[in-house]
């Protein structure tokens, strides 16, 4: 088995790479994927988003090591084990990120990845329905749209933000991210529109693209060059040969794991694991970043939430409506309004994100109270805490060791306390007078810094946005793993292209920037001239230095 390009992973970036690298028909591509089919209602029905993440069939099911600042809880760290990777099990929320995120990337050594450089790739990949004209793509493979927005609670949330003095944005993925607005989702015609739907399936219709179901054990490196991938399938170990390059797109947990198993990483750690050191790159597995969030839940005094649909019978009705007619509650992920806010005067870009949900519920679908309710998922998105990923052993099938080191920076506590108090201010606005009942969580007795900190230690969870473990940077940066053209430093014929190469976490959900990374990396791999830089200037709040709104 051989191809010009061998891609490890069919997720957000890997699928985009397969599509673009094979586009002109001159290059052969093999995609290696361990996970199975993404066909079925648990994945394809947007409202069923909680199901695939809870199923071992679709999820690698990783857990962090005990987190010392979170009562030593082991935090769930899901990654997609299915065609389409995590884009097939995620919440389908589409957020490009803020312009300052990508300008920061360039400042950190990722030359050519500033906002002006990446905006054309966002436009190339998007098929936006109703986005801001001139700022959005309209004929790309990735369908992006808003939900039906039929529930009055969505509108109450946006109106409450206006009453509190915050900005409103008509398109947070356009020129102006900051403010309250309607949330976008990667759905189309009532179905999840994953990277597999947008990129991989069209690519697999080409004669020069092949998908191989297998377990990738390590990258084969000969005389300083990646020549293939050692795989296991059907109980046999084989090698898939790469005539040109191997591209690792296996997630922020498995991409560094594969590099280390192949002898690329911190020399001392590799020796400890009994692995021959091919290239000493101390940054492999370091710089792990993530977003955290908690659920702020409130009783609704009016029977307008989704609570009535939680009994099994009504879930079955919603499922049948979706299955046979592609209509009803099943066609949306139910995250249909949102906010992107700045935490304080002097903060230039939004750093607090809200997902609003018209029901008070846990992620597994259980009601938080025996009543109608509503909630926000809220978190501080620019944490300075950093973790790492390392090997548990030299066994390729052993789970990686994941240490997030959540809440290890003092500023995180200050910002999350502010999130609690700010949410109370928003839910206290006149727009919620018709609906506001008792506070379910954190609870009205949780008021002091100490009480809020206690709540956070027990209830903060991952937003499932890990990144940064194969950092992109300048070649002379000792902690960089790949250069700005996504080439692994010190090895020929090997690249990494997924969220693991982000030098710094972006503001918002990571599916969109991960796909963009695949799109842009494809041009680097093919030696093409990058798309022309944009000269569009995004909106920055003129009051940012003196006001938080």
UniProtKB/Swiss-Prot annotation:
Reactions the enzyme catalyzes: choline + A = betaine aldehyde + AH2; betaine aldehyde + NAD(+) + H2O = glycine betaine + NADH + 2 H(+)
The enzyme's E.C. designation: 1.1.99.1, 1.2.1.8
GO terms classed as biological process: glycine betaine biosynthetic process from choline
One of the record's GO cellular component terms: plasma membrane
Keyword Protease: no
InterPro entries: BetA, FAD/NAD-bd_sf, GMC_OxRdtase, GMC_OxRdtase_N, GMC_OxRtase_C
Protein family membership: Belongs to the GMC oxidoreductase family.
UniProt function note: Involved in the biosynthesis of the osmoprotectant glycine betaine. Catalyzes the oxidation of choline to betaine aldehyde and betaine aldehyde to glycine betaine at the same rate.
Matches recorded under NCBIfam families: betA, PRK02106.1
Protein name, entry field: Oxygen-dependent choline dehydrogenase
Source organism phylogeny: Bacteria, Pseudomonadati, Pseudomonadota, Alphaproteobacteria, Hyphomicrobiales
């Amino acid at each position: 088995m051989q191809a010009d390009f061998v891609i490890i992973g069919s997720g957000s970036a890997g699928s985009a790479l397969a599509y673009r690298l094979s586009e002109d028909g001159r290059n052969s591509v093999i995609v290696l994927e361990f996970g199975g089919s993404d066909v079925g209602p648990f994945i394809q029905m947007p409202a069923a988003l909680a199901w695939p993440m809870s199923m071992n069939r679709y999820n690698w099911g990783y857990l962090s090591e005990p987190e010392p600042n979170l009562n030593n809880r082991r935090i769930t760290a899901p990654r997609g084990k299915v065609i389409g990777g995590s884009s097939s099990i995620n919440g389908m929320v589409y957020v490009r990120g803020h312009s300052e995120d990508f300008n920061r990337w360039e400042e950190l050594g990722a030359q050519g990845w500033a906002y002006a450089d990446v905006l054309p790739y966002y436009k190339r990949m998007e098929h936006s329905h109703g986005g801001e004209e001139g700022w959005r793509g309209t004929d790309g493979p990735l369908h992006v749209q808003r939900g039906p927005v039929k529930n009055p609670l969505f509108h109450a949330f946006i109106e409450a933000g206006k009453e509190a003095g915050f900005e409103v944005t008509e398109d947070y993925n356009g020129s102006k991210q900051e403010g309250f607005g309607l949330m976008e989702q990667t759905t189309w015609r009532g179905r999840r529109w994953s990277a597999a739907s947008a990129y991989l399936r069209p690519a697999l219709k080409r004669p020069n693209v092949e998908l191989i179901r297998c377990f990738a054990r390590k990258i084969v490196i000969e005389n300083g060059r990646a020549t293939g991938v050692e795989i296991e399938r059907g109980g046999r170990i084989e090698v898939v040969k790469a005539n040109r390059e191997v591209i690792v797109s296996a997630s922020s947990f498995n991409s560094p794991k594969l590099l280390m198993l192949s002898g690329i990483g911190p020399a001392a750690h590799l020796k400890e694991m009994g692995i021959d050191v091919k290239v000493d790159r101390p940054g492999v597995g370091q710089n792990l970043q993530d977003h955290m969030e908690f659920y702020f839940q409130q009783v609704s005094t009016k029977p307008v939430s989704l609570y009535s649909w939680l009994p099994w019978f009504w879930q079955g009705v919603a499922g049948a409506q979706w299955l046979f007619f592609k209509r009803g509650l099943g066609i949306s992920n139910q995250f249909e309004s949102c906010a992107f806010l700045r935490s304080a005067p002097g903060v230039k870009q939004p750093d607090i994100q809200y997902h609003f949900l018209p029901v008070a519920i846990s992620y597994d679908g259980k009601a938080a109270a025996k009543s109608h309710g509503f909630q926000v998922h809220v978190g501080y998105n620019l944490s300075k805490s950093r973790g790492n990923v390392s090997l548990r052993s030299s066994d390729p099938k052993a789970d990686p060791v994941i240490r997030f080191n959540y809440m290890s920076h003092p500023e995180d506590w200050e910002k999350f306390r502010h999130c609690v108090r700010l949410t109370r201010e928003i839910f206290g606005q006149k727009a919620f007078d018709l609906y506001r009942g008792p506070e379910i969580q954190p609870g009205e007795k949780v008021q002091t810094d100490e009480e809020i900190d206690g709540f956070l230690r027990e209830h903060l969870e991952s937003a499932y946005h890990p990144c940064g473990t194969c950092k992109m940077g300048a070649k002379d940066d000792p902690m960089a793993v790949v250069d700005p053209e996504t080439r692994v430093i010190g090895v020929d014929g090997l690249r990494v292209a997924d969220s693991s190469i982000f030098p710094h976490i972006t503001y918002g959900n990571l599916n969109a920037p991960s796909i963009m990374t695949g799109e842009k990396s494809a041009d680097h791999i093919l030696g093409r001239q990058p798309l022309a830089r944009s000269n569009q200037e995004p909106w920055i709040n003129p009051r940012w230095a003196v006001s938080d709104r």
